[in-house]
């Protein structure tokens, strides 16, 4: 982080995973960003004077357009129960950070949400006879996370984040839907990797 600070980086983006272990307790790797690790990294960043973007994946590992796996501890939850769990999880993390006086400056509700989040409940399309998912399920989960942010860290900016940053049609499709449903957010975030996504 000192190298970043010395090169005028202003913001640090730190991810949060729910339960970074296999069933037998072995860490999954990839940085092991459970609650404790996430808090440790935010403390380091804040001490160095960075602003912090906290990126909630709402998964036990990487969440991206190909996989938005529901955390194992939440596997039996659906509907309002799942929304409440996501709200409580978000609130718990933010309360802990607030108590340590290291609240994030921006909060990202989900990661690379091209097809929604916390599948299958928050998947943006329904398949076959499934009665879950669709934009209703997705927006319900987004709003649950946003509610926690508004309650605990009301000054933090709220980001909704997609991948494929050069795909105008994708961004219009997703953001037209969520803005029509009155999702309250401040910033559109995007991932853009020229190797995969080409150029603008």
Predicted regions and their residues:
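Substrate-binding cleft and catalytic face of glycoside hydrolase catalytic domains
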Residues: 3-134, 138-157, 163
């Amino acid at each position: 982080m000192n190298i970043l600070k010395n090169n005028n980086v202003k913001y640090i983006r730190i991810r949060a995973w729910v339960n970074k272990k296999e069933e037998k307790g072995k860490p999954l790797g990839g940085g092991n960003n459970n609650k404790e690790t996430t808090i440790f990294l935010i403390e380091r960043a804040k001490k160095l004077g960075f602003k912090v973007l906290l990126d909630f994946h709402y998964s036990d590992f990487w969440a991206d357009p190909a996989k938005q796996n529901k955390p194992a501890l939440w596997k039996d939850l659906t509907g309002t129960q799942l929304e409440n769990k996501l709200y409580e999880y978000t609130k718990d993390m933010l309360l802990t950070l607030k108590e340590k006086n290291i609240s994030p400056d921006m909060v990202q509700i989900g990661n690379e949400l091209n097809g929604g989040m916390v599948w299958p409940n928050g998947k943006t399309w329904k398949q076959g006879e499934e009665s879950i998912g669709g934009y209703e399920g997705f927006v319900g989960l987004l709003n649950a996370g946003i509610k926690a942010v508004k309650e605990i860290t009301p000054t933090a900016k709220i980001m909704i984040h997609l991948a494929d940053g050069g795909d105008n049609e994708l961004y219009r499709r997703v953001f037209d839907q969520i803005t029509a449903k009155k999702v309250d957010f401040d910033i559109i975030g995007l991932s853009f990797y020229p190797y995969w996504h080409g150029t603008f």
